[in-house]
Amino acid sequence: MGNSYAGQLKSARFEEALHNSIEASLRCSSVVPRPIFSQLYLDPDQHPFSSADVKPKVEDLDKDLVNRYTQNGSLDFSNNLTVNEMEDDEDDEEMSDSNSPPIPYSQKPAPEGSCTTDGFCQAGKDLRLVSLCMEQIDIPAGFLLVGAKSPNLPEHILVCAVDKRFLPDDHGKNALLGFSGNCIGCGERGFRYFTEFSNHINLKLTTQPKKQKHLKYYLVRSSQGVLSKGPLICWKECRSRQSSASCHSIKPSSSVSSTVTPENGTTNGYKSGFTQTDAANGNSSHGGKGSASSSTPAHTGNYSLSPRPSYASGDQATMFISGPPKKRHRGWYPGSPLPQPGLVVPVPTVRPLSRTEPLLSAPVPQTPLTGILQPRPIPAGETVIVPENLLSNSGVRPVILIGYGTLPYFYGNVGDIVVSPLLVNCYKIPQLENKDLEKLGLTGSQFLSVENMILLTIQYLVRLGPDQVPLREEFEQIMLKAMQEFTLRERALQIGAQCVPVSPGQLPWLARLIASVSQDLVHVVVTQNSLAEGISETLRTLSEMRHYQRLPDYVVVICASKIRGNEFCVVVLGQHQSRALAESMLTTSEFLKEISYELITGKVSFLASHFKTTSLGDDLDKLLEKMQQRRGDSVVTPFDGDLNECVSPQEAAAMIPTQNLDLDNETFHIYQPQLTVARKLLSQVCAIADSGSQSLDLGHFSKVDFIIIVPRSEVLVQQTLQRIRQSGVLVDLGLEENGTAHQRAEKYVVRLDNEIQTKFEVFMRRVKQNPYTLFVLVHDNSHVELTSVISGSLSHSEPSHGLADRVINCREVLEAFNLLVLQVSSFPYTLQTQQSRISSSNEVHWIQLDTGEDVGCEEKLYFGLSEYSKSLQWGITSPLLRCDETFEKMVNTLLERYPRLHSMVVRCYLLIQQYSEALMALTTMASLRDHSTPETLSIMDDLISSPGKNKSGRGHMLIIRVPSVQLAMLAKERLQEVRDKLGLQYRFEIILGNPATELSVATHFVARLKSWRGNEPEEWIPRTYQDLDGLPCIVILTGKDPLGETFPRSLKYCDLRLIDSSYLTRTALEQEVGLACCYVSKEVIRGPTVALDLSGKEQERAAVSENDSDELLIDLERPQSNSSAVTGTSGSIMENGVSSSSTADKSQKQSLTPSFQSPATSLGLDEGVSASSAGAGAGETLKQECDSLGPQMASSTTSKPSSSSSGPRTLPWPGQPIRGCRGPQAALPPVVILSKAAYSLLGSQKSGKLPSSSSLLPHADVAWVSSLRPLLNKDMSSEEQSLYYRQWTLARQHHADYSNQLDPASGTRNFHPRRLLLTGPPQVGKTGSYLQFLRILFRMLIRLLEVDVYDEEEINTDHNESSEVSQSEGEPWPDIESFSKMPFDVSVHDPKYSLMSLVYTEKLAGVKQEVIKESKVEEPRKRETVSIMLTKYAAYNTFHHCEQCRQYMDFTSASQMSDSTLHAFTFSSSMLGEEVQLYFIIPKSKESHFVFSKQGKHLESMRLPLVSDKNLNAVKSPIFTPSSGRHEHGLLNLFHAMEGISHLHLLVVKEYEMPLYRKYWPNHIMLVLPGMFNNAGVGAARFLIKELSYHNLELERNRLEELGIKRQCVWPFIVMMDDSCVLWNIHSVQEPSSQPMEVGVSSKNVSLKTVLQHIEATPKIVHYAILGIQKWSSKLTSQSLKAPFSRCHVHDFILLNTDLTQNVQYDFNRYFCEDADFNLRTNSSGLLICRFNNFSLMKKHVQVGGQRDFIIKPKIMVSESLAPILPLQYICAPDSEHTLLAAPAQFLLEKFLQHASYKLFPKAIHNFRSPVLAIDCYLNIGPEVAICYISSRPHSSNVNCEGVFFSGLLLYLCDSFVGADLKKFKFLKGATLCVICQDRSSLRQTIVRLELEDEWQFRLRDEFQTANSSDDKPLYFLTGRHV
């Protein structure tokens, strides 16, 4: 036995140590005692290889040792060694094959002639790291270099190449079993066994070769390329030896790495049974020969316990595997799942450890197996022989729940037992992070002992009672609570030692004590030797039992072994429980296969023959025949008559019902919640676009296209098509023409079937071909069939397997930048695992529906799962959620009789019989009434009697849910046969709802539906369930899952009695009840007792409260009993359509009162009610809704659309909730009949919003991460639930998300950036919501293609004035002779001046003062804007990208940044009185526009063209655009506006903003203003542009003069243009046609190039100073275009002649009105300003940057929350203690003047005859005042002010031209003066120089300064009064 007997070991000493160890571990509760083996073998004084070993007796060995060996025979080393000891002492010794002392591990001798030197391979090549560290080693992809340690060369590491799949990941997990490696030395490849490989590289081992032991390190290359020893290979999950379970204490078989996988994830989580070696069995068959085969003991591999190995997991396991397996890979699957009789069936076992450790949690990767080995002899104590005919004799197939410890082998009739791992993971304590443990209220050290776990299990089983089945999730919570209690108790005691654990001796009687209260339902069997004894005993008793004897439901088998400690398992014998547990282990697909197998093989024949007779014992078929003969040819009247009235079939077919005009099928509304959710989706898309990840660029797209992928359901396809057609979305998105949209809709909906591949390829081709279209792939019901492609190809599963994965997760979809994926699901849990591909921030959840305030305004409320649960507390006599107890009793009786059939088969047969007999009972055989359950009887009664009550013939729908297609077809045939024989075939229809086929409805029923609908075409047939509204029918709904089909309002009953214990996941259960979810009348929820249960007595008491109609009266949380005061809704009870007479109709009815004949279940927000395209009204509202996204959606940077928009509020809720047969009725929720198992989970809602089903496993394709986890809180919102599932669930191996594992490099998961998830309860209206989303997404893209431009009429216009100089209309250019004779119009017409001071003209003096609108100083008003589509000639901001202007924008790479050069340019300015240094940043590509010095370093000038140049592909004038604060939003991309031709464009930016502008506009020339202008206004920029341009003109003239060109030939113009100019138009006046009408104006969009080239071609252009164009307005009239040219102010976009205006300067101090000021100055200098009226400019409303006001703050902030500072605080008395402000002095002054006219110029207010006289300046001093501008320059032209008395005088920074001749102006008495100067001394000098004190009176207190500190150079001004 290897060297395990080393040391002087007497067996007595061994026993003593063993007992001491056990005793110590039992006594101790805190400190880990030193286990037995470390005491015996690791004593330092003992030499490990002493030769004087003593043979122990085989018996002792058997008794004591065997059970201490773990699976590989390795010794159970303690877990308190240090890491290093563990590294070396982890020798996994094997028991040798004889009883002799150990011999070294014998290995095959090396082949002849091969090298055996240590450190070299058998081919003689060196493998040592020292010699290979500099070599370039070539290794195949997927391999890693690792270092192996040879025991003979401790100082060396040998280099090997190993396939990394066989190595563990960073957490010590996921290494494949086995080995695959290559020799680096000789290059030999393909070693498949580590043993073979270790021989080849000469490891010369003394022990069994193990990769875990000998492959020690990863090898890494350093930065110098040297190969060196890297990190240790992490074979164990955890190295911390204190708290967690010992990882190496259970060894997997020889080359299985002990990977710990996530609990019940991909592995089975149990170890295979322990087989001893032959030697240990005393069967030394090999006689100690030193061959390799004899020395390797027979390992049992790891057994797959699952009938579908590809899904093998800890949650499902059955006993279907036989024979110990060979070692295989995880990816290989077993051949035959059926057991071979008589072979051993290994059963997983969990080995106990020494008692000191917490429970073991080391599941091993399963290796399913193919070959069947010969069974090895096994000690009798470890086997159980399953008795023959166990199932037949006892009628029970026992289920053995694996507990804790080693399960024995089972022989014999193993098909009759099932081994279930249901609770096994509850007994393993998972490895949890400390922080997670703290959250759970646990400490790492305190876990439960086995004894406690046994007692808890028994307690749980006792508590379950006879009806319930153990639920894993329930038990996990019990275990968690118990641990939390222990932790609390331990903390309370502070010292763990005082906590007395249950001793093994006490365990049996404590266990029996607990079980004694169970009324014999739980038995405890205690054995001494092994569990096998107890199990055998139990099975034997079972097989010998007589049927009448009562069995316990559970037998708990405890093995109280002294050696192994306690082990236990539970044998479930209860008829109901064992069946439920066995069936719940199969997945839905598996049990459906099982059912079809039972039907095909005829196993059901006994059952079928049982149901051939009625409950009274008559032969059913004969009885029906008899009834048919008695009736003869006639049939029961189809409607409007009793069941006894008969007519001929011809008459029946010809009966036409009255038309029902109330149908609201076609009118489509979209409701407020749907709008809100659509907006949430849109805002999430904007958030993705804004998130810097560059995964979505919304500015790129101009169109939206979509495809909707739905599961394989024909009805769902048709339903979705109907929604698309009714919503009009195809026309709205511009995808189809109005006429053809109906037919074309089909290409937008695709089913997940085998044809999807081709259709999807067509779609993806469209995606690739249309890069400017944003495609949306909607994956509806995305939780269905979300299996991975890989698992689908390996297992023979459904054809649809993996299709969704193939489509949604294919590479093209992930990479397409113009494709958004929207997954829509009511049960999204399977998409919310740790491996989810959707970021949790991209989930959009339906808005919480149960908020009180919504209820007031909406007719319909959603009635979903939690409302159903809560309705049980309403206390009404006929609840909405029911369990048919009578039916359940019948089922149980039958199940006992047919133990071999699946319970669903039995239930289905019974259900068919129930409905058949109910039909017969109600028509012909009243004697059968007592044999139908009252539930079934009342449903059928309602179904067949309701059409008879009136002429419309409308009735109810009943859904019977039968998941198995074969059973459903059987049910349809049987029921149809019974119906037809009873003559009811015209009364109600029976429809098979098979997802794979279309609906088929008998022609006479189609005719009836058509006549109700009225206007349907001849060939119309019902295609969706909603089309069946009002048709009395039974729909037998089949298929694995319900797929989201919407049912009509006439659905009244939903029979889910077949949905049983096989549906134990949250999704499976909830989606079944989801069938019945719908919108109901408000009354139902507000006063359920009134609406649903009005017996006569309560009608009288129902108080009608007038004032309560707006609030939610019945809180859903509060139970309300029948007798509590019932509050009705406003209005009388008759409104609900309930009258006492109708209640009396059928007194014996047990279901809802019959007055609700057709509850409108799914009116209102049906799944996907969508916006009405019918009627202009709705269309209008929609447009409004989209427009109301508001201007802020124009850029993609605003991610939240405004929700307070006016649009949607006006959308109509339907006025009448339901259109029934008699007036308006309440829409009611359908009644749902459940099986007992489902009822207990859905009906038992204790508190909170969610029913108990929410704590189940969320979906069969996911697994819990750990059995220790917090409970899903019942009040969690869906967002919180999502986060919970993302933390606590994992995708299983066959799940499509399984492959999305952690990225090892970054430690994060890959979320797909363009994928969203929309979740909302079933039937809440998600389809309508996402169709609306598509619509508003398109609107928003259009908004991005639209621009808001100012649309304001000119101000101060007087169209009556006729130009004195007549201009001939239609002239392209002005004639300078006649133009210069026109007077200049000094009035400012630009609408942005509407709140500024008027400029005085003689005409203004004649205006009556009352006419002028008084506009008090107000907040900056909202200027009028209008939305215009951008055209191909627009100027763009940075959000525009297209292929054509990519070169122009040049974003290619960061390296481009360095391609531009910085040049200083200095010139002197007389105005500034100093040198100015500007910087040019010139990209390489633009250098041709400049002249550099010979050395090429120094910038000399900017090239200018000649006046005579005629180049059609260029504009001559350089374009300057000053811009500030708009690096992203400024319209600086002129590529399209210039039609791509050559032009020179310079951005003028402030120094501090330069880096930003440079980043966004790397290919633009920048002109950077000096730092001193960082706070300056736009006046400074314009001043410097003009100064620079004049200086440059002189330089160019000098340069070109040397080339012989005359100075006056150089082009003197520049364009100065704002950064918000977006579009240019040309206008022409259309000739009026013959009939007298308004002359029209036609306008056309033109490019900036066209405008500039036209203006530059003006004859004698050099004689004009400024040329401009007018501002666009939608109200441009032919009147304003009468004169093609005006001599007036021009703004925003001007051609400036720098030569003529050399001496007219912009005021560089100015922030406001600098252009009007400059125009007035230019005009007074006698220069010509010309405006071209046939061109107009559109200016974009840009919300950021530009002339936006500074926020004026105090210089020293005292507190954060200061009141806003008022304009009058912008000035103060000099040297006062006033709050000083942090703003430029000039800015404060201009802002002050705008608001101070009342203070400064009281006489001027509204007195336009007496304006304020302003010398050399135009300043805005408020709109109430007119300013008369007078220039002081000699020879200047000024307005005539003869006889004008001025009301004030404004002197602003006046220069030496202003002299004492001011005295010639006349002033009113009391006129006021304001003199503004740079500082106090110049203020005094000015007053003296101008002799102002002669006429004006000053007071000391009239001196002011702007509220700046002295460092900020305040401005000073003095006021005075005229005397």
Curated annotation (Swiss-Prot):
Residues 87-111, 246-326, 1101-1222 are annotated as: Disordered. This is GREB1-like protein. Belongs to the GREB1 family. Residues 87-96 have a biased composition (Acidic residues). The keyword Oxidoreductase does not apply. InterPro entries: GREB1, GREB1-like_2nd, GREB1-like_C, GREB1-like_cpSF2, GREB1_N, TAGT. Widely expressed, with prominent expression in the cochlea. Expressed at high levels in fetal kidney. In adult tissues, highest levels in vagina, cervix and epididymis. GO terms for biological process: branching involved in ureteric bud morphogenesis; cardiac muscle cell differentiation; cardiac ventricle development; embryonic heart tube development; kidney development; male genitalia development; mesonephric duct development; metanephros development. The chain crosses the membrane at residues 1843-1862. The keyword Transport does not apply. GO terms for cellular component: membrane. It comes from Homo sapiens (Human). Residues 263-278, 296-307, 1119-1161 have a biased composition (Polar residues). It is found in: Membrane. Keywords: Deafness, Developmental protein, Disease variant, Membrane, Non-syndromic deafness, Transmembrane, Transmembrane helix. Changing V1690M: In RHDA3; probable loss of function; does not rescue renal hypoplasia in zebrafish morphants. Plays a major role in early metanephros and genital development. It comes from the Eukaryota.
